[in-house]
Regions:
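Membrane-helix interfacial "entry" motifs
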Residues: 18, 22, 104, 108-116, ...
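Transmembrane helix-bundle signature of multi-pass membrane transporters/permeases
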Residues: 72-73, 112, 150-155
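Transmembrane alpha-helical segments and their cytosolic interface motifs
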Residues: 105-136
Length: 215
């Protein structure tokens, strides 16, 4: 039998601020966002697993926790490296006991634009730049190039996860406005930077041979 998610929580008293230890724990858990990926709800299970420590501290009422877990199992599809941005906003709303319909709407609004932004930031910018810095080492036959690539990439993406969690949790819904108003400009700038770097790599490492026959 389907569970009917209530519009309001039973306990409407705002919860205390989450401590940094809990926020950092959820940053680590966000790495498992796609561990239970499926085509019915995409990343929903991984999302709930990641945000659950915060929900358990916010909702001391068991029925409220049940309702929160239920609506946090809604369909979700966002960029895995930027998911903590959405987590921080949702946790801020949960802490202030916003209506469940509001939380669900904000979650969708925040998660949507992150796909394009994340692709531009990581796959079109960070990866080409990191590859450019380490390719020369790898081309000399040193395994250090591959190791440095993995270290730089993973340190960068985890630093972004950590910063976004703390930043968006502090801003709350204001972060959504900032995201939607600047999403196109940010994506365009990141894409241009990535293309510029790829062009530089081609100029440095690419070679082309032309055979010209006259007469």
């Amino acid at each position: 039998m389907a569970y009917n998610i209530p519009e309001r929580y039973q306990d409407l008293t705002p919860a205390p601020q989450l401590d940094k230890k809990t926020l950092n724990k959820m940053v680590w858990l966000s790495c498992f966002l796609q561990a239970s990926f499926n085509y019915e709800r995409m990343q929903a299970c991984g999302w709930l697993w990641g945000i659950l420590p915060g929900l358990q501290k916010i909702h001391t009422n068991k029925e409220d926790l049940k309702a929160s877990m239920a609506h946090n199992l809604d369909f979700l599809n966002t960029h895995p490296f930027l998911v903590t941005f959405v987590m921080g906003i949702v946790l801020s709303l949960e802490q202030n006991k916003a209506e469940t319909s509001t939380i669900r709407s904000v979650r969708i609004s925040a998660a949507g634009p992150l796909g394009g932004i994340g692709d531009a930031l990581f796959w079109l910018t960070l990866v080409p730049i990191t590859a450019g810095l380490t390719a020369n080492i790898a081309m000399d036959g040193s395994i250090l190039g591959a190791i440095l690539f993995l270290v730089i990439f993973n340190v960068a993406q985890f630093a972004v996860r950590w910063w976004l969690m703390h930043w968006s949790y502090g801003l709350g819904t204001k972060a959504v406005t900032m995201l939607t108003s600047n999403a196109k400009e940010f994506t365009r700038a990141a894409s241009i930077l990535g293309i510029f770097v790829v062009g530089g790599l081609i100029a440095n490492y690419g070679t082309t041979s032309l055979r010209i026959v006259v007469g």
